[in-house]
Amino acid sequence: MSEEELNNRDTESKQEHDENNSNFEAGSAHMNLPVLPLREVIFFPGDYLPIFIGRKGSIQAMDKALAETSENTGRMLLIAQKNPKKEIPEGKDLYEVGVIAKIAEPKINLQDGGVKLMVIVECRARAVNFRKSEGVLEADVLPIEEEESDNVDIEAYRRAVVQNFEKCVKLSETIPDEIIGLLSQIDSTSRIADLVTASINLKLSVKQEILETVDLLERIKKVHALLEKELGVLQVKQQIKEKTESQIKKSHKVYLLNEQLKAITKELYDKEGEEYDELVDLEKKIGNGKLSAEAKEKVSKELKKLKNMVPMSAEATVVRNYVDWIISLPWKKKGKMITDIAASERILKASHYGIEKVKERIIEYLAVQNRTKSFKGSILCLLGPPGVGKTSLASAIAEATGRPFVRMSLGGIKDESEIKGHRRTYIGAMPGKIIQHMKKAKLSNPVFLLDEIDKMSSDFRSDPAFALLEVLDPEQNAHFVDHYLEVEYDLSDVMFVATANSLNMIPALLDRLEIIRLEAYSEEEKLQIAEHYLIGKLQREHGLKKSEWSISKEALKLLIRRYTRESGVRNLKRELANLMRKAVKKLGVQSGLKSIEVSVKNLKKYAGVEKYTFGTAEPENLVGMTTGLAYTQTGGDLIMIEAVLLPGKGEIRSTGKLGEVMQESVQAAYSFVCSNCNKFGFTSKFFKSKDVHLHVPEGATSKDGPSAGVAICTSIVSVMTGIPVRSNVAMTGEVSLRGKVMEIGGLKEKLLAAVRGGIKIVLIPASNEKDLENIPKSVKNAVRIIPVSTVSEALTFTLAEQPTPLAVDVWPDIPLSSTQQSEQRV
């Protein structure tokens, strides 16, 4: 249906209403009408408009009005609420004056359960008495009679109101222009006053005041005053709009709206003498902060730039974020540190068992710093296998010094920007993780843990390890520049601590670190850690009392041996937690059960099938079977090296998934034995007629390294001479072609494996004798350790009997090829 047809329909409906209700007159006696409370809206006499009803009480009032059979059929009292938030208003919640409205058209039910009505507002009315009838709010209503007057003052105000209203319509963007034509057709001064009041932007209470003003002269005066004020507001708004439009392009709509907001804000603040609180607050923070001179100058320029920007623009957001980052950093804001070295030592000893050398080195480091009041020096790097307490030790250092602790994981980082940030030209740019963690620390002197420093990766674009050089150099980190900040930030008060599992780092970075090695825990150390640290902590976490759960020392040893294989205690902690979970469940299910004790007998019941086996000494001496010692990421272990003799041409082949270094070690050992065969009791002719097959069991496991050289030599000599190898002897050491036994690593872990495997004698390189000082006494007391310098010396301990040397043997002549002969002639 077209708009013209709708207007004709509305006009016909209104005319029909006027004809059918000509007998209704304002000022007649009281009438009883249902009340329809209005929220945030005021209607005036003469309005013909839709209303939407949603509240249950209002719908009931409408239904009652439609059900009325008297001359008031379809009539209701529309009256505004004093508090629009009141959901079910009573009489006291409504104003006294409202309007009588007539339902002009059949109601339309809406999908949301509400109702749409077209009503004609007939006259003002006063509610004399409110009451409820059958759940519907009703009122005794007295229509208010309004009289027109030819008073000269009224006519003067009328003309002024019409003139000013026309100006408002031209300036306003919300009042339609068509209303001016409608105003010219109205003769009633009362209707003009009501129409103007309904059209301009006024508070609900002001419109209610106009509705309650019956005296026409007083009402037209009030409307004139309100219109004058509204006209002034619209004129100022127009001035602001014109001023804004002269500064920007007309096509930039978003920019226009932002500038209008800026101009309005400036107009208000200039008139009231106020300042923009947020920018002033930033200025105060810059002035009161301990920023460096360079940072203060830079951020002041950025703040000045921010004041001249559009608040909602993208560039303003970037600048604001930058200013916030600069202000939020701890510039020279230091925390109070613990200077009592004895107290620091107690904290370290209470937090970690064993590792006395490590704790002693840390205390020395702290003592020097306290005395010199300088933090320039070596950067500590805690090196050790997983689970030995590197990260927790760094946290304990923070506690021992009274500094805040922040941890930055470097594992997998492959972009330099992760360390030094992105430049602000990039979208979404942020500072690097160094600056981010300094903000998190809130102080300029935290303990800063660089975790897994050896796990950084690189690509063809950049290597983040080089970005760390500036951070970890005590001579440079006082002038660290993040790409995002673009100003120097002092990191010289930060105590950097790094952790690593290996030394696979660039030499320049490694040169800046002081390596402190944390070796694998011995079985005794694991036992002590479990008893004094892990069990109590896990009992608290699982809500178990000491009297409710316990584990015997023998069961704990078995748990360590058969259910874990690691250098540290992480898996041991998991296994203990598993035992406690099962205990908590059992105590909850069996009400009569008061406590559970885990012993060797019932350990399998709670922990399940044994997960690991470890190498053990052979029960008897065997030919070609040698016990070696290996070092892995999970600690030490025994490896069995087998050799058999086969008819052949004097060759050796090796199996067992050996790495390149270990294969070269096999070749070196074979060459040494071959070149010294007469010393070991067999001839070169015999040697050339046999092949040796060397095998290292557990073929699915990769093996590499040179430290099995002594064991390989022993197996080859044993199989060549037929002399058995002592099963209670294990050995480790690299072998040269001259039969020298050279230094190896992982001595502590290898000795722990030997003790665990029931070995009685361990041969080590003589050059490793100095490392025995760091071996626990319990280990040295459990096994006999013999340093050896040569293979011949080692064979005196490994073979069940010594071979009888032969006279100097002459190797058979081997015919030269034609090429070799020509080369020899040349």
Swiss-Prot record:
**CDD domains assigned to the protein according to its UniProt record, in alphabetical order:** RecA-like_Lon (cd19500)
Question: In the UniProt record, does the keyword Cell division occur?
Answer: no
Concerning Pfam families, the annotation shows: AAA, Lon_C, Lon_lid, LON_substr_bdg
Q: Which UniProt keywords apply?
A: ATP-binding, Cytoplasm, Hydrolase, Nucleotide-binding, Protease, Serine protease, Stress response
Which stretches make up the Lon N-terminal domain?
Answer: 33-231
Q: Where is the active site?
A: 707, 750
What EC designation does it have? Answer: 3.4.21.53
Q: Where is this region: Disordered?
A: 1-27
Q: Which NCBIfam families match?
A: lon, PRK10787.1
State the family it belongs to. Belongs to the peptidase S16 family.
Functional note: ATP-dependent serine protease that mediates the selective degradation of mutant and abnormal proteins as well as certain short-lived regulatory proteins. Required for cellular homeostasis and for survival from DNA damage and developmental changes induced by stress. Degrades polypeptides processively to yield small peptide fragments that are 5 to 10 amino acids long. Binds to DNA in a double-stranded, site-specific manner.
Protein known as: Lon protease
Q: Could you tell me which species this protein originates from? A: Neorickettsia sennetsu (strain ATCC VR-367 / Miyayama) (Ehrlichia sennetsu)
Q: Which gene encodes it?
A: lon
